[in-house]
């Protein structure tokens, strides 16, 4: 696909869980670490921007942020985070929250949402763009996929796609 759109116009992830607050992170591709401050200059969160704003940088990009400390999937764990996808309905493509084995991986940009082709992996995809070739439904949708496969209605799709209201607002 000859689209050079950013994975999303603007994304911030804020991690609040005690397990991850003290974790160290590997930032890859176009991703960067940033602080958000309130009107008084007080830092309100430690955040990550995965891709630059498409309207500021039309070349788009792909980025990933991975916890350097592996999670033992034999034990229960809780992750709590906020996602801001911006307010531009014309942006693309979305974001994936994924579990995979390497802290330096950056998957396919665009319709791969930074996790595409990473195998083995498990991803929750928040998709804001319809890619007809992937059997995407019309409108924003969420799905759970494995092994970096973002095509719907196959054996790697574990749940979804579920159409949801506007994810960008």
Regions from the language model: what does each represent?
Residues 21-169:
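Polar, low-complexity loop segments and adjacent catalytic/binding residues used for recognizing
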């Amino acid at each position: 696909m000859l689209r050079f759109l950013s994975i999303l116009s603007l994304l911030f992830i804020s991690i609040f869980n005690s397990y991850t607050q003290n974790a160290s992170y590997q930032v890859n591709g176009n991703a960067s670490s940033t602080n958000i401050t309130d009107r008084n200059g007080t830092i309100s969160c430690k955040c990550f921007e995965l891709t630059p704003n498409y309207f500021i940088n039309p070349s788009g990009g792909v980025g990933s942020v991975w916890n350097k400390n592996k999670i033992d999937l034999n034990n229960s764990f809780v992750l709590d985070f906020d996602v801001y996808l911006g307010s531009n309905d014309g942006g693309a493509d979305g974001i994936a929250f994924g579990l995979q084995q390497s802290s330096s991986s950056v998957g396919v940009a665009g319709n791969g949402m930074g996790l595409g082709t990473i195998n083995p992996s498990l991803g929750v995809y928040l998709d804001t763009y319809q890619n007809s070739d992937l059997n995407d439904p019309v409108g924003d949708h969420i799905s759970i996929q494995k092994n970096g496969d973002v095509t719907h209605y196959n054996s790697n799709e574990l749940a979804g796609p579920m159409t949801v209201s506007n994810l960008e607002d």
